[in-house]
């Protein structure tokens, strides 16, 4: 009887275990686990005491050894790890709530080289990130994270690109440099296509040729002039009507994506709120660290909101204070109007600021066009801005990247005034530091370095700079505030790592991935030299030379950047358009 009772008890234990188990895991699991036992997870075809008693309520079904081996066997991971020495360091942790394993892989100086998720139920690798994708979520190919899903769709992007090309091409001279210039501008779209697929080692190099070409082309125009003036192939009213339609379309797309604000626009709202509360933005961004959590969990199940020093529950953006003061002051009117809840929500103030400065660029280009070429040029410039897909890309991301070009375009409109030029360069430079490189060029326009003009330019630059930097006076100590400002802005920008240009790929220490740090250093020195040369050559400059050389300096800055983004294309676009469309002898 005892034997029958034991057998019955054993059956009651084994049958539910076998019946509740999932199908067998993939056959690619390694043959042995750390204990030397068979490692195939318990399934319907598996009948053993080990399978019956291995699952613990709330515990994992798979062993760490099995999970790591499955992850390393993933083709994408295996291909990347082939670039490193064998036997990397690994770790796998199990999350009871999600029933998933997080696997991490390290290799020597390269640090963490792979990251992923493995489902405990069936051993499936649900996420696998390698190289740049480990530290940078924006490198993982999430279409629509920037610019929105509609704009990034091929059936919107390609027609918009075609409208830009057809609208500005000179049909009388199709086979010309002018046509090539327009095609090169649009070629950034090829790089973006790979970026949206998470292929950073293809997308980043593909952005270099158009930047380099446009740099050489605009520098040539600035130093040597242009052979002919391109002619518009369409009636002015047609371009104006299309421009108005596209302008309305981009605003509509922006408003239809209420949560399409990336961290850049969010930072502007936070900074403006801090200023209105009597604090400088620097060193006062919302952080996570060990502060008490508050708010709801995000898509990954993590709670990112924290109770900050001001007692509010705010969404973290710890590195949001890396921009110049003007990048935050520009958001003050919208924050005063719409306020801020403390959360990374719809952020209407960010939408309003992005749309507002986009409209200021368009209006500024119209004014510049009317001054230097009449209504046809005004319409062509406005059309070029609204039809170019990457300007919509920036405004739909609700960034601060239209602020700098808006200020510079209006400064260009008043270029005959040294006070206006000095003010514009200062305000633009304290938004994005790239604009400070334009100071020598704009100082010496139009007839070289002249004492009276230089004094007026310098005085305006100084007054505007002091007015913007006055936000540092909101801190208890001006010295400490200035030190924090330099550390959080220039200090961070000069030391940051990034995979979004080829120059910093040496950080991965991967076989076949070049270390181009020396090339970047040469480029940076060359750009600084260019910023000085254009101040002296040519000695006499007209509007065409000023526009083209401004574009060349900004392009050089972007070409040498460690962290480059498609959002930066609007910085130089107005001056590229002016260089291509302004009359040769504009006055």
Model-derived regions, located:
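Bacterial N-terminal signal peptides
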Residues: 7-17
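Membrane-embedded, hydrophobic transmembrane alpha-helices
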Residues: 10, 20-21, 137-239, 246
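Short, non-transmembrane alpha-helical segments in secretory-pathway proteins
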Residues: 52-94, 150-153
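Exposed beta-strand-loop-beta-strand "reactive/processing" segments of non-cytosolic proteins
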Residues: 78-121
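Extended, hydrophilic extramembrane loops/domains of integral membrane proteins
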Residues: 108-144, 319-322, 327
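Primarily membrane-embedded glycan-assembly and transfer machineries that use lipid-linked glycans
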Residues: 184-191, 195-235, 246, 250-412, ...
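Transmembrane helices and adjacent periplasmic/lumenal helix-loop junctions
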Residues: 423-447, 467, 560-568
